[in-house]
């Protein structure tokens, strides 16, 4: 046990976690020449293309240091704020962390939020300055930033380049010398932390775990604490590039477990595995059910594909237990699902995976967050509003509460004004402003989650020329004045375009929606009024003008009554058409509502 080291790599997006992991694997010989490829641990095509890590991965390496053999378990973590719970569980499975900072970009918001997670779990932090070979790198200044943040000695910061392989040996030596060995009781009852699960179509769910006390043997009966279900450990082993079956996994080590579970929802990340015969009394602390933050409707473009969409969603859920969905129907779009996601990136990824892996073309409605509504009749009973149509009638509504977050934004000092302007426009309240260095400022805001869902991230990058980085944590619900804005086409409500908005923004957004739809809806043979309404009150209107034939073209001479007769006849026809006419909404219209400011 004293020769095991468990560590993870934490960094902001794009600071080079996955490439550094590749180099560590090369250096320790965990990968043969034939298996090498860029971002080896990112197994999804999507992860490779976008250059992000979506799932956590784990891999074991052997390394000989001063004649002794050591086993290193690397747990790779996602960098994106949507997956912060997954990161926190991976961190809890380690004793040390490599804090990777890009020498050109310095410390960013997620570097700090993941660092706090690591410090809360008492991890030994090894700072690594990555990308020092870049022409734009600024190693001295960034080293000072790291020293300020961690309070460490400048000599402890390891300069490295994952691209060229510089500093890799120093990193491995630092892991062995500075990261403590696992401390656990070998003879205590089994207690292991689940930090990830992967669905394998042939063998069911593979559970990745780290043993804290005791050991887990092949064939023994085990129990998951949160769900209370018992299983047989059909196979246990360690994770090399391929799985490596073993008879038992001992205290302090990381491994995988196959029990033949077919439903990923039974394996909860952060849960505790214990023996069914001799269970542990205390579970590993910090487990929580992952709650979706953002909701959107997903509908098949062709209503007949509903069943295919259902089976695709179920297959995705096997691999991604944080996805939740319920059937719902809409008058405009037919049958579909109301889905819950961890954040906007998660929503995009699911949509892309549906298109890629299952060839489904889907329509996504306006994403919104989950509100709590209270009626006058029962002011204490919470009504969960995940869909604008669930909001009670305005007359019976007592109050609505919406989720707030604490947003941390790190930006260059030159852009503070722009960033503040954007956050205040998004109903944020500034709570703190700290200068990290003379150049870089950390701003914290309390703001509604709903404002971030739309286009906040893109606009933040725009106003700061790409320099600002952003991170958030939920801080609970607050009361807020919200109204439901409906969009009417030809006097019919289009339920898929309804949105819950704050009173102050309702008029502006309603007007913008109407203008945007006017551009996108093709002209028909009759006038189409597009209206935005709060309840029965119309707040904005645009009209898509009719296409009309010039009926008077065949009249020579000037008899006005003849012309008038033809025009009146045309007018009657158009009126009749409008009563029976049906307006098709193009797919772009639904997406365009999300990008109102372009």
Curated annotation (Swiss-Prot):
<dbReference type="InterPro" id="IPR006297">
    <property type="entry name" value="EF-4"/>
</dbReference>
<dbReference type="Pfam" id="PF03144">
    <property type="entry name" value="GTP_EFTU_D2"/>
</dbReference>
<dbReference type="InterPro" id="IPR005225">
    <property type="entry name" value="Small_GTP-bd"/>
</dbReference>
<keyword id="KW-0648">Protein biosynthesis</keyword>
<dbReference type="GO" id="GO:0005525">
    <property type="term" value="F:GTP binding"/>
</dbReference>
<dbReference type="GO" id="GO:0045727">
    <property type="term" value="P:positive regulation of translation"/>
</dbReference>
<dbReference type="InterPro" id="IPR027417">
    <property type="entry name" value="P-loop_NTPase"/>
</dbReference>
<dbReference type="InterPro" id="IPR035647">
    <property type="entry name" value="EFG_III/V"/>
</dbReference>
<keyword id="KW-0547">Nucleotide-binding</keyword>
<keyword id="KW-0378">Hydrolase</keyword>
<dbReference type="GO" id="GO:0005886">
    <property type="term" value="C:plasma membrane"/>
</dbReference>
<dbReference type="Pfam" id="PF06421">
    <property type="entry name" value="LepA_C"/>
</dbReference>
<dbReference type="InterPro" id="IPR004161">
    <property type="entry name" value="EFTu-like_2"/>
</dbReference>
<dbReference type="InterPro" id="IPR038363">
    <property type="entry name" value="LepA_C_sf"/>
</dbReference>
<dbReference type="InterPro" id="IPR000640">
    <property type="entry name" value="EFG_V-like"/>
</dbReference>
<dbReference type="InterPro" id="IPR035654">
    <property type="entry name" value="LepA_IV"/>
</dbReference>
<dbReference type="GO" id="GO:0043022">
    <property type="term" value="F:ribosome binding"/>
</dbReference>
<protein>
    <recommendedName>
        <fullName>Elongation factor 4</fullName>
        <ecNumber>3.6.5.n1</ecNumber>
    </recommendedName>
</protein>
<feature type="binding site">
    <location>
        <begin position="130"/>
        <end position="133"/>
    </location>
    <ligand>
        <name>GTP</name>
    </ligand>
</feature>
<dbReference type="InterPro" id="IPR013842">
    <property type="entry name" value="LepA_CTD"/>
</dbReference>
<keyword id="KW-1003">Cell membrane</keyword>
<keyword id="KW-0342">GTP-binding</keyword>
<keyword id="KW-0472">Membrane</keyword>
<dbReference type="Pfam" id="PF00679">
    <property type="entry name" value="EFG_C"/>
</dbReference>
<dbReference type="InterPro" id="IPR009000">
    <property type="entry name" value="Transl_B-barrel_sf"/>
</dbReference>
<feature type="binding site">
    <location>
        <begin position="14"/>
        <end position="19"/>
    </location>
    <ligand>
        <name>GTP</name>
    </ligand>
</feature>
<comment type="similarity">
    <text>Belongs to the TRAFAC class translation factor GTPase superfamily. Classic translation factor GTPase family. LepA subfamily.</text>
</comment>
<keyword id="KW-0997">Cell inner membrane</keyword>
<dbReference type="Pfam" id="PF00009">
    <property type="entry name" value="GTP_EFTU"/>
</dbReference>
<dbReference type="GO" id="GO:0003746">
    <property type="term" value="F:translation elongation factor activity"/>
</dbReference>
<dbReference type="InterPro" id="IPR000795">
    <property type="entry name" value="T_Tr_GTP-bd_dom"/>
</dbReference>
<feature type="domain" description="tr-type G">
    <location>
        <begin position="2"/>
        <end position="183"/>
    </location>
</feature>
<dbReference type="GO" id="GO:0003924">
    <property type="term" value="F:GTPase activity"/>
</dbReference>
<comment type="function">
    <text>Required for accurate and efficient protein synthesis under certain stress conditions. May act as a fidelity factor of the translation reaction, by catalyzing a one-codon backward translocation of tRNAs on improperly translocated ribosomes. Back-translocation proceeds from a post-translocation (POST) complex to a pre-translocation (PRE) complex, thus giving elongation factor G a second chance to translocate the tRNAs correctly. Binds to ribosomes in a GTP-dependent manner.</text>
</comment>
